[in-house]
């Protein structure tokens, strides 16, 4: 949570800087009434379209009572049969209006629109549009804090995981290097998401002033969002090349993985930014009601599908090898593939659910909670599966914990127990290898194989140094 507090301080600085850069704009009253101007433009446009529709549509023959088509000031109503209640969705002119709710207008049996008993004028019932406004605001705040907590937990777990990977040199190998880059992409994404949530989405002044910095932040956010999924694809490609294509090759060139993980997401992010500036240039690019987001989501979905294909093919190959040879190395590879195979559907399920948002208020609220959990707790999930549940990491931590107990144990009994435990752990390290090897081949990093690193620990004159 300390990380979250520091990010909030950074966010405050970001907001002050953004507002300071637009101080001259705030001196003009037009920005104060920005929302009023937008609302007025929407209403005028809707009124113009309504009158055009009224003039173009053919009139019905009056064989039965009929309420005439009309414009009520906010919405356009078609001809309605007598005794029928006409309905349509609430307009999005005002922030406290819920477009999922319905407006009603009653056509009386006489063929006249309902007159309000107090004003004695035709009346449309808009009361349901803001009936649940307070509940919607509470839900929005709950989702806001749910996202902040999710990214705070993700940041904490990811930074701890990166600390473990960098501190323990026995874990250094190409596969762990890919893990580090994947974790780092999630760290950066969580940081920029917290900045956007607190400095932009939750600050109407920044959104109304529409500084360039908030659009740049949105661009960085979408770029890093793509990096998350393409580094997951790198994990799948690496395992597929190692196990299927190169038949347990010793070493791969990581430069191509860096280009795919950090370089390729720049392409859809840049195309989206250019298209957004020309075709849907809303304030801070904060709206999600545009099909231009498919420029970002399309490559991500493709990466998920390709990754799933690679992983299923890897599982097929490993199962075949296990049936034929019963090699222990194949079993070790299966454990690594299993972790990635679990993550891919979990990280991609949001795109399966995205088109199926329900219409009802309660069901829509449940949907929003599920989507926020799936989206904002991904970093925590990745750190848990790839680091905290990793047998190699657990073995290394257990061994160093036992070394600590031996060095700082307060009694002979504790020293003896820790020594026996350390001896058992050291012998088990040969079973849980830091990096996989097949037929004597070892994955190398920085000129030193992982077997060599483990061997140097086990053969040292002072194993606890």
Curated annotation (Swiss-Prot):
It is a multi-pass membrane protein. Residues 167-177, 241-254, 317-331, 390-465 are cytoplasmic. Glycans are attached at residues 22, 68, 120, 125. The chain crosses the membrane at residues 142-166, 178-200, 212-240, 255-275, 292-316, 332-353, 369-389. Belongs to the G-protein coupled receptor 2 family. Gene3D superfamilies: GPCR, family 2, extracellular hormone receptor domain, Rhodopsin 7-helix transmembrane proteins. Residues 21-141, 201-211, 276-291, 354-368 are extracellular. It is found in: Cell membrane. GO terms for cellular component: plasma membrane. It comes from the Eukaryota. GO terms for biological process: adenylate cyclase-activating G protein-coupled receptor signaling pathway; angiogenesis; cell surface receptor signaling pathway. Disulfide bonds join 50-76, 67-107, 90-129. It comes from Paralichthys olivaceus (Bastard halibut). GO terms for molecular function: adrenomedullin receptor activity; calcitonin gene-related peptide receptor activity; calcitonin receptor activity. Keywords: Cell membrane, Disulfide bond, G-protein coupled receptor, Glycoprotein, Membrane, Receptor, Signal, Transducer, Transmembrane, Transmembrane helix. The keyword Glycoprotein applies. Detected in gill, brain, heart, intestine and testis. May function as G protein-coupled receptor for calcitonin-gene-related peptides and adrenomedullin. Specificity may be modulated by accessory proteins. May activate cAMP-dependent pathway. InterPro entries: GPCR_2 (IPR050332), GPCR_2-like_7TM (IPR017981), GPCR_2_calcitonin_rcpt_fam (IPR003287), GPCR_2_CGRP1_rcpt (IPR003289), GPCR_2_extracell_dom_sf (IPR036445), GPCR_2_extracellular_dom (IPR001879), GPCR_2_secretin-like (IPR000832), GPCR_2_secretin-like_CS (IPR017983). This is Calcitonin gene-related peptide type 1 receptor. Residues 1-20 form the signal peptide. SMART domains: HormR.
């Amino acid at each position: 949570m300390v990380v979250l507090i520091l990010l909030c301080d950074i966010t405050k600085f970001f907001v002050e800087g953004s507002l300071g850069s637009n101080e001259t704009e705030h001196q003009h009253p037009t920005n104060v009434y920005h929302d009023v101007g937008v609302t007025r433009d929407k209403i005028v446009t809707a009124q113009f379209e309504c009158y055009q529709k009224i003039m173009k549509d053919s009139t019905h023959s009056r064989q039965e009572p009929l309420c005439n088509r009309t414009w009520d000031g906010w919405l356009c109503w078609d001809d309605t049969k007598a005794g029928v209640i006409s309905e349509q969705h609430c307009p999005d002119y005002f922030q406290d209006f819920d477009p999922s709710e319905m407006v009603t207008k009653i056509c009386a049996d006489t063929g006249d629109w309902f007159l309000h008993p107090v004003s004695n004028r035709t009346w449309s019932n808009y009361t349901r549009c803001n009936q649940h406004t307070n509940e919607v605001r509470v839900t929005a705040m709950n989702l806001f804090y749910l996202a902040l907590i999710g990214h705070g937990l993700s940041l904490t777990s990811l930074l701890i995981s990166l600390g473990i990977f960098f501190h323990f040199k026995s874990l250094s190998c190409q596969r762990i290097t890919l893990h580090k880059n994947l974790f780092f992409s999630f760290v950066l994404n969580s940081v920029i998401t917290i900045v956007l949530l607190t400095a932009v989405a939750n600050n109407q002044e920044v959104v109304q002033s529409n500084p360039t910095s908030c659009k740049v932040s949105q661009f960085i956010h979408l770029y890093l969002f793509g990096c998350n999924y393409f580094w997951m694809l790198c994990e799948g490609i690496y395992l597929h090349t190692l196990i299927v294509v190169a038949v347990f090759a010793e070493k791969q060139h990581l430069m191509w993985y860096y280009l795919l993980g950090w370089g390729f997401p720049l392409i859809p992010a840049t195309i989206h930014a250019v298209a957004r500036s020309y075709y849907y240039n809303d304030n801070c690019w904060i709206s999600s009601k545009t099909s231009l987001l498919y420029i970002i989501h399309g490559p991500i979905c493709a990466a998920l599908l390709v990754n799933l294909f690679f992983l299923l093919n890897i599982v097929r190959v490993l199962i075949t090898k296990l049936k034929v040879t019963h090699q222990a190395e194949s079993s070790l590879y299966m454990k690594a593939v299993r972790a990635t195979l679990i993550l891919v559907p979990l990280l991609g399920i949001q795109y399966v659910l995205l088109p199926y948002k329900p219409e009802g208020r309660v069901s829509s609220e449940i949907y929003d909670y599920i989507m926020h959990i799936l989206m904002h707790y991904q970093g925590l999930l990745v750190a848990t599966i790839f680091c905290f549940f990793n047998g190699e990491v657990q073995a290394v931590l257990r061994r160093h914990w036992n070394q600590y107990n031996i060095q700082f144990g307060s009694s002979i009994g504790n020293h003896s127990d820790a020594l026996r435990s350390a001896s058992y752990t050291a012998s088990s390290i040969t079973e849980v290898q830091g990096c996989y090897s097949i037929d004597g081949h070892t994955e190398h990093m920085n000129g030193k194989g992982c077997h060599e690193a483990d061997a140097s620990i086990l053969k040292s004159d002072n194993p606890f140094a």
